[in-house]
Amino acid sequence: MKQHISDKQLSKFFKENKLAGAIHYHTTFNRRTRYITINNNCHSTILFIHGAPASLMESKEYFTDPELRQTFNMIAVDRPGYGRSGYGDPEPSIKKQADIVKGIIDECRIHRPFIIYAASYGASIACRLLMDFPLTADGLVLVAPSLCPGEEKYLWITPLVEHSFIRKIILPHHRTSNTEKFNHKDELSKMLPWWKNIRVPVMYIQGEKDKMIYTTNAGFARENLVNVPSLEINFIKGQKHVIDKKENPFIIKKILELLKQAGQLTKTTTTSNL
């Protein structure tokens, strides 16, 4: 499915899959960001934040999964510069992207426990969100996450593309991902003092042969997520950065395990506040 799927195509996808989906637009920093909600009449919520280059449709198999549909109301966002959120117009600031996502969450009716599922560069944004707003969610699923400054593959052509005529002729989603790649090390460095602010259970999942986001990010997570109640790290044998769809049952299992942990913590917190 193409990167910048239209609202009409998205509505068709909802209808074909019998999803109670709705399309919304949120404006922050003079940026218009598209997101969707899927109401499954459930008592918990999951938000999907995609990687780069991608769009909210990166998670379409999860939208239609029977087990997840029975468990979660769903939210998914086209990150700035992707899909119908200013296609090709990037936002290099991880903090600003996190603020945009927070604004979307505030517009939605969130049933808790609330889980955030984030992949690749989307994971950086999810972590920044919970650094700045620690009470926003109850658990994090990080898939092939970019967390540590510099611990990812950088291409020699990235700065050339960023500062030459090539930028004007590449596809819009590659223009956005190139800008994010060019700025990512500096943006992650700005987050270094704040990892202690994350206080929710974390499920880390990555292909053991990932050559795009290095597996050393797992060690960084162990060293820096010092205040999370739990951190489970899973490497999937034989998988690279983009994890094959055949592994979706394993990932869904891990999402549901995290939900159980988050639910227990939410119940404990509620009881302690009575």
Feature locations, PLM:
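Alpha/beta-hydrolase fold catalytic core
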Residues: 1-46, 71-72, 260-274
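Short beta-strand/loop motif that positions the catalytic acidic residue
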Residues: 198, 204-206, 210
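Active-site loop/oxyanion-hole signature of alpha/beta-hydrolase fold enzymes
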Residues: 76-114
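Active-site nucleophile elbow and catalytic-triad environment of alpha/beta-hydrolase enzymes
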Residues: 178-194
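Catalytic histidine-centered segment of alpha/beta-hydrolase-like enzymes
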Residues: 239-249
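Conserved alpha/beta-hydrolase "acid-adjacent" motif
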Residues: 211-217, 244
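Conserved HGGG/HGGXW glycine-rich cap/lid loop of the alpha/beta-hydrolase fold
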Residues: 38-84
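Flexible "cap/lid" loop of the alpha/beta hydrolase fold
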Residues: 124-127, 131, 140-166
